[in-house]
Amino acid sequence: MELLCVLAAVAALFCGCTVLTLKCRVPASVAPLTALSLIVAVLTLAAMAGVLYPITWAVYALCLAGGVWVLATRKNHAGAAQKLFTPGSVLFWGMALAFTVYFFVRQPMAADFDELSLWATAVKITKVNNDLYATAELGTPWAATQNPGLPLLSYFFQFFGNYADWKIYVGYDILYFSVFAAVVGAIPRSKWRVAVPMAAVLWCVPFFF
């Protein structure tokens, strides 16, 4: 059930990217990063205004309704598929789905990495209270110093179902893969073979920092 909840978030993201690509002419490889940035910006403003929960429902509804509307009203579906599925976007959606299932199976915990920074604690507080975690009573000022962007990104993927540590990893990795897609998207379709080694290089880059 929890896997389906996260897949619903991925589906909403796909619908939002569909609107950006087919209506706003955002390249399919850049659409995931654009959509995630817009979602986090909206949720940050909503959390600051104290209306995070209803606005998140509205974001989901707009993404899903927009995607369905665009696909249902488009006449040339073959052309739509060609625009939506480029080397960069295929890499993104494939990795997003694969790692969603992987983290669901592995169920990684945040306890080994959350002793001081409270990055996972911030997400849990946001999920439980449906409010910006910086306003919570924790007995420590540390949480108030954290940037709300990443916890709210995780909140988007935590929205349905119960809180789970593995969903945080899903949200962060999907953001990570969206950067992959944007870089790979610079490669023309005719040179798709270059995308494979480039993706391998991008995968290794974070391990050097």
Go through each PLM region and give its residues.
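Lipid-exposed faces of alpha-helical membrane segments in multi-pass integral membrane proteins
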Residues: 8, 38-46, 62-65, 94-100, ...
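Internal/C-terminal transmembrane anchor helices
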Residues: 85-105
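Short charge-dense sequence patches
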Residues: 72-79, 98-109
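Active-site lumenal/periplasmic loops and adjacent helix-entry segments of GT-C-fold
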Residues: 101-207
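Membrane-interface helix caps and helix-loop-helix hairpins in membrane proteins
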Residues: 47-54, 106-111, 209
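Membrane-embedded, hydrophobic transmembrane alpha-helices
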Residues: 1-81
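Membrane-interfacial entry segments at the cytosolic side of transmembrane helices
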Residues: 52-57, 78-92, 191-195
